[in-house]
């Protein structure tokens, strides 16, 4: 085991605070509408230019191991806030730095770190309660667009495209972001349920212009096994032919004489049909067939539940207003399923999302919810260069997270005003002793910090602006983009309550841990010898991992 170096009390805290300051100072210059850019070196290709706090934080690794510990703990604040709320990373970093800086002064003066932490925790609880009182629901498209614009560093075009996407696929719909091919941002919407399986034979195509099989008001047969024998299918085909409607068959596979018979009937115009493979694999396939059954008001004909293909009736078939089957995808529009059943299914999948441990499973379950709840929207980000594309895409993703958070928990006035307005609730708090009172004071000071930084990044005087904002009430604040005072909500400067709340809670949590830290343990750096050089060289290979994130 390698030898360790241990630092205690003041010298340990001093090193840790240095690390916090280096990381926070690099991140906080990006805060606000006039935030500055940070250029990140890439081991391969051109450097990345960003105004996204968490991207900057993730890049920072310090040479001094003790300073690096402090930096990594603040990095945790940024990435945790980003994971849960999707935005607010820079605000969280600014708050954490302020709480640590102020707190360390009190610790150096001999106050009890545990009592300071208790005071900080009390103040945070009071602030969160006050934020909830200030919060208003975010319902209109205009408000959603405003939240998106602010989060995308005051880009109204991004806000608008996100609001349009949410309007089209609903608040719960899946919205994905990908690289576009032009200079403009584009929005593409897929209505209804779409899955990535196309027709099993091109002879099913009945719309030559679009090269798709289009079925109007079809019956939908769902089967979890392979269909090869036409005898199994005949009874249900006869019933569908009598009803005079088209038929879509979704099964594990359809081949042999069954497929040949369907194709011949289709060409001769006796029965309009189309066959596709069921989406997914294994257990996921069963679940998706069940989803389609609930969406279309049908039943999956499976031996497990005692149903067989030859005894299937029209009552077991699903129905939809329209089905479009392309070469590689099938879209079911306006399924005839019962709304309550669909809602119940969505609730059930949501419960599975809560329990899912892997990101992949969560993503797949989320897709299933979207397909049931109203469709998928695709935002294609346009840009002139690859560097701009990456930066813009990151901002669109941030804005998307922020708008979801706003819809979930509501909105508060932005630009650091909401935190400033909670000061009255915090200043009335009393701790159990003098040290806890000091902890409350630390948070009081930290609540000003985001606004201070926004104003500083604009090149204005923070103290003057803060005093003027404190003279006003409720939504009155300073719009840094236009350098004017007024009602922040009317000016469209809004923050999601969830983002502001998480930024403060995560910042206070990590800062509290730092204040109560009394020893740091790190490996003693190895002497650079003949063998050491080789180890260092191999370490450089770690940079290759970064290539995974590149758009090749």
From Swiss-Prot:
Name of the gene encoding the protein in the UniProt record = groEL
Q: Indicate the quaternary assembly.
A: Forms a cylinder of 14 subunits composed of two heptameric rings stacked back-to-back. Interacts with the co-chaperonin GroES.
Specify the enzyme's EC class, one word: isomerase
Q: Which domain of life is it from?
A: Bacteria
Residues holding ATP = 30-33, 51, 87-91, 415, 479-481, 495
Species the sequence originates in: Nitrosospira multiformis (strain ATCC 25196 / NCIMB 11849 / C 71)
- The protein in question is named Chaperonin GroEL
Which Gene Ontology terms of cellular component type are present? cytoplasm
- Keywords of this protein's UniProt record, alphabetized? ATP-binding, Chaperone, Cytoplasm, Isomerase, Nucleotide-binding
Catalytic activity reads: ATP + H2O + a folded polypeptide = ADP + phosphate + an unfolded polypeptide
Question: Which Gene Ontology MF annotations are present?
Answer: ATP binding; ATP-dependent protein folding chaperone; isomerase activity; unfolded protein binding
Q: According to its UniProt record, what is one Pfam family this protein matches?
A: Cpn60_TCP1
